[in-house]
């Protein structure tokens, strides 16, 4: 909506105005560009705001949302009074007809009429309803429109909104602080927000109520004439014609006889009394908003809050304009914790890139070679049409993943820590650097470290955006010729760098195609077109094929099992509408729970685990699958406790508790599903269930022993030491407990700064990469199990009890200081 909504009852399409400007009658002038006040939210034409302003605003609102103060007619000919911007007594509820005898009382004639009106189309300034008023007011430049036109417009708008929701790139749009950005970009939204949510103007209300009272006749908006018109209409309605005539003579004003079925003065005063008592109750329900989120939005709107994504952002510099011997900090064994800011770094980027050894894992990777000629780039033969070793990225092997799984509590990165791994150097010995330097290390002229590439592509969204990264790669691709450099040397150097850029771009598209919005894809196509025009057809073909492959595979699941899934263990009454989940075998319940939870786990994207998105109100929209899996975990835990405490007898509770213990055991030992096992164990350890002493004693000895083993292996002692050891030995498919990774990521995020001396802390990103890459490795191998719709449906519709109700039942079933013989 590009124009402010202005509700008017006049038929000529004119709106309320103040000195020729459009005015919203319910506005306090706090929105930017307000015609009531441009310099200050509380300055009304140089006069001090008063309580009468609040009264006026409340007078202008009815239950239907129509404006009761429309443009006033001062004579029967319809001439407007230019000195009065807001008029009264224009029938917004429909014209009923004018009284033939002025001396008669409209009150007695229309005592049985509805105060809302007949809803017919009134003549002149009448209106058939608030929809028509809204339509004519919002289109006052072109005259009034019919209802059908307004509804048609709304349908078109609704269709556009549906298209927006169906847009595949909708979820890629940054929605953090969207309220603040919308209000700043569209000032008319502020006006609408103030109408429907007056509590957001608490400061404005407080200052107005605390101000001194002034008389209505000095009010710059309502004015003396409008108040007199209200009084005259009230006298007319009550049949006090003599009093009306005396007032007209004294005030030297003539009352144009309008026909109303109510006293507008009384009606509006009633609204004032009702609304003034509950002025802060006229708000929308904000209970769905986190208090921290509301605080951040409020601070951001005032310009006092800095978005983390914008923190430490420096002015962009072309990648070749940045000095080679600066903006990078290397890891050194003798590195101090706090290096001096004044000591420049002397090592150049080129030296670093050529002296490090490539990762040993490169030999295990498949490569794509597009031979354009018989020459090879590694032999330093110059050929612009040759592409060599466009390596495709391969995920870390399971052995490496198991070695990377920590068996001890995560430790924070120190400034003296080297970025190395079990298989040798994983990347350049860089602790921190500028974005340009990191991109140069990503596309070196000679040696190329694939592990560094995987780390960068997985973690880059924690310090930049896909748009900026693509821009930097394009800058890197266009290699300038240095002063004094021969054409042959320049071509040889540019060919090496361009091949690296294309290699990174191909890997990026292949492994992280979800990062590419429609805008980015168009930018890549533009780059490919420029490559074709310069004769690099083969270069363009490799990237084009990768792009087309990503578009075809988007949203597909290409997993193919060579072995058939085990036959489901379904009960005989599987087709019965009385099917009970506890009549299903524990093994099959474990399988269906595993399938449902793994589907959510496999959908988690690497970006959902960056910057603690799942734990920050304004960033939670970036982690939908993480939050869904967390919610599912809590749901299973609550379901476990609810199911056990649904039975008043000890033997029944023991039977259900034993069933859950068997489900957790099968998930952990046979399916490597530690997440669901942990959720069930969490329900068993809930305070309402844990205290059920007699129920646990009723369990068979073998079941009690299994319960003890679960407690041992899934214990949180020593940062889940036993669980980490068990996970390292597990073979895929596997569903790890997500909570451990979230804990580690939180430790890495909060224990290490994002920037060191203003440069991106890449060492921190390497630590985070280790945890996220582990999650990705478990996502690759899916479970070969057969889903059973009837059982899965039962496992989705849990009936859960609140914590208070659970504990109340627990105390009722097994009271304190009671003997076993005293309990059912």
Swiss-Prot record:
Ribonucleoprotein in keyword set: no
Which residues does the annotated region (Disordered) include? Answer: 1-51, 65-167, 330-354, 398-425
Q: Where is the composition biased (Polar residues)?
A: 83-95, 413-425
Basic and acidic residues: compositionally biased ranges: 331-341
Upregulation details from the record are: Up-regulated by Pseudomonas aeruginosa, PAO1 strain and PA14 strain infection and down-regulated by phagocytic stimuli.
* Superkingdom of the source species: Eukaryota
The answer to keyword Iron-sulfur applying to this record is no
Q: Which InterPro entries match?
A: LisH, Ras-like_GEF, Ras-like_Gua-exchang_fac_N, Ras_GEF_dom_sf, RASGEF_cat_dom, RASGEF_cat_dom_sf
Q: Where is the LisH domain?
A: 223-255
SUPFAM superfamilies reported for this sequence: Ras GEF (SSF48366)
Q: What does this protein do?
A: Promotes the exchange of Ras-bound GDP by GTP.
Indicate what this protein is called per its UniProt record: Ras guanine nucleotide exchange factor I
Q: Which organism is it from?
A: Dictyostelium discoideum (Social amoeba)
Gene symbol here is gefI
């Amino acid at each position: 909506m590009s124009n402010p909504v202005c509700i008017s009852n006049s038929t000529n399409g004119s709106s309320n105005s103040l000195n020729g400007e459009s005015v919203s009658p319910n506005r306090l002038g706090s929105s930017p560009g307000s015609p009531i006040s441009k310099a200050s939210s509380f300055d009304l034409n140089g006069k001090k705001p008063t309580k009468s302003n609040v009264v006026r605003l409340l007078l202008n609102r009815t239950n239907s949302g129509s404006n009761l103060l429309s443009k006033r007619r001062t004579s029967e000919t319809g001439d407007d009074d230019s000195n009065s911007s807001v008029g009264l007594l224009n029938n917004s509820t429909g014209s009923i007809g004018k009284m033939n005898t002025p001396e008669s009382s409209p009150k007695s004639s229309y005592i049985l009429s509805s105060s809302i009106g007949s809803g017919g189309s009134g003549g002149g300034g009448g209106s058939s309803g608030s929809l028509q008023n809204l339509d004519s007011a919002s289109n006052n430049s072109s005259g009034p429109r019919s209802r059908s036109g307004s509804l048609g417009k709304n349908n078109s708008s609704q269709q556009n909104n549906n298209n927006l929701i169906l847009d595949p790139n909708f979820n890629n749009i940054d929605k953090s602080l969207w309220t603040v950005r919308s209000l700043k970009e569209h000032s008319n939204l502020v006006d609408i927000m103030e109408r429907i949510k007056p509590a957001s103007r608490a400061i404005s209300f407080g200052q107005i109520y605390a101000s001194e009272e002034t008389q209505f006749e000095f009010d710059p908006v309502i004015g003396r004439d409008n108040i007199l018109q209200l009084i005259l209409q009230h006298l007319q309605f009550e049949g006090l014609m003599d009093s009306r005539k005396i007032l007209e003579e004294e005030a030297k004003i003539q009352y144009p006889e309008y026909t109303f079925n109510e006293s507008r003065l009384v009606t509006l005063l009633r609204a004032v009394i009702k609304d003034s008592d509950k002025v802060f109750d006229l708000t929308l329900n904000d209970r769905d908003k986190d208090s921290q989120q509301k605080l951040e939005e409020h601070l951001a709107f005032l310009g006092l809050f800095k978005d983390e994504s914008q923190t430490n952002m420096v002015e962009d510099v072309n990648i070749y304009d940045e000095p080679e011997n600066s903006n990078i900090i290397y890891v050194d064994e003798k590195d101090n914790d706090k290096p001096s800011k004044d000591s420049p770094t002397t090592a150049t980027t080129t030296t670093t890139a050529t002296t490090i050894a490539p990762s040993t894992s490169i030999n295990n990777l498949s490569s794509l070679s597009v031979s354009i000629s018989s020459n090879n780039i590694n032999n330093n033969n110059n050929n612009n049409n040759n592409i060599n070793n466009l390596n495709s990225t391969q995920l870390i092997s399971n052995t490496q993943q198991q070695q990377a799984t920590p068996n001890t509590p995560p430790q924070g990165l120190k400034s003296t820590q080297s970025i190395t791994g079990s298989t040798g150097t994983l990347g350049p010995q860089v602790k921190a650097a500028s974005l340009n330097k990191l991109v140069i290390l990503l596309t070196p002229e000679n040696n190329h470290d694939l592990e560094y590439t995987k780390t960068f592509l997985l973690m880059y969204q924690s310090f930049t955006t896909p748009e900026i990264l693509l821009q930097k790669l394009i800058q890197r691709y266009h290699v300038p010729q240095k002063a004094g450099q021969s054409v042959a040397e320049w071509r040889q150097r540019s060919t090496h760098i361009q091949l690296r850029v294309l290699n990174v771009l191909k890997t990026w598209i292949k492994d992280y195609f979800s990062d590419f919005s429609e805008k980015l894809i168009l930018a890549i196509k533009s780059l490919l077109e420029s490559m074709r025009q310069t004769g690099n057809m083969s270069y363009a073909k490799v990237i084009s094929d990768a792009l087309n492959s990503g578009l075809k595979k988007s949203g597909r699941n290409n997993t193919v099992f060579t072995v058939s899934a085990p036959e489901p263990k379904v009960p005989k009454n599987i087709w019965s509408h009385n099917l009970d989940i506890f009549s299903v075998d524990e093994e099959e319940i474990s399988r269906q729970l595993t399938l449902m939870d793994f589907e959510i786990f496999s959908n988690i994207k690497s970006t959902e685990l960056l910057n603690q998105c799942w734990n920050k109100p304004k960033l939670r929209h970036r982690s939908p699958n993480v939050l869904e899996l967390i919610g599912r975990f809590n749901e299973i835990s609550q379901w476990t406790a609810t199911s056990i405490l649904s039975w008043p007898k000890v033997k029944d509770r023991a039977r259900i508790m034993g069933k859950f213990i068997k489900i957790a055991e099968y998930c952990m030992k046979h399916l490597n599903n530690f997440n669901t096992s942990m959720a069930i164990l969490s329900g068993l350890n809930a305070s309402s269930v844990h205290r059920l002493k007699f129920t646990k004693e009723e369990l068979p000895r073998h079941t009690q022993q299994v319960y003890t083993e679960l407690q041992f292996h899934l214990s949180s002692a020593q940062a889940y030491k036993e669980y980490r050891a068990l996970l390292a030995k597990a073979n895929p498919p596997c569903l790890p407990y997500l909570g451990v990774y979230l804990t580690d990521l939180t430790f890495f995020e909060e224990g290490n700064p994002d920037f060191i001396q203003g440069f991106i802390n890449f060492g921190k990103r390497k630590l985070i990469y280790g945890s996220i890459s582990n999650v990705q490795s478990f996502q690759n191998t899916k479970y070969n199990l057969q889903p059973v719709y009837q059982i899965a449906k039962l496992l989705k519709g849990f009936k859960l009890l609140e914590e208070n109700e659970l504990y109340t039942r627990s105390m009722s079933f097994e009271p304190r200081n009671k003997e076993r013989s005293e309990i059912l």
